Amino acid sequence: LATDIQLARAASVAALATEGVHAMGRGRYVEAATYEGPEKVSGVVVGPDEVEVHVVVRWPLPRPIPEIAGSIIARVAPQAGGRKTMVMVDDLEVGADEDL
């Protein structure tokens, strides 16, 4: 079974490899991160019962947000050791030439 920091690293890599993800999110009220010793993985919170993956998605969206989240969950859940995997979309990254 992977350590929390190994799982956080793997979840971050999986999320960033997902179409539509611009970057890892920072969380809303507190920083979303997993720590072990001097190492920090931003955007992933590994708890005893769940893994939270915080992301910033690109606009325009290549597909609906629930599909992007589903792809992240499909990549992370098999590595999560039975923990519930949740995706939080913290923000949208809008290109300078895009209108909302």
Model-based region annotation:
Residues 1-21:
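N-terminal presequence-like segments and adjacent domain-start helices
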Residues 61-83:
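Short, non-transmembrane amphipathic alpha-helical segments
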Residues 55-59:
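Short beta-strand-to-loop capping motifs
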Residues 15, 36, 45, 79-81:
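A generic structural signal for short, solvent-exposed coil/turn residues
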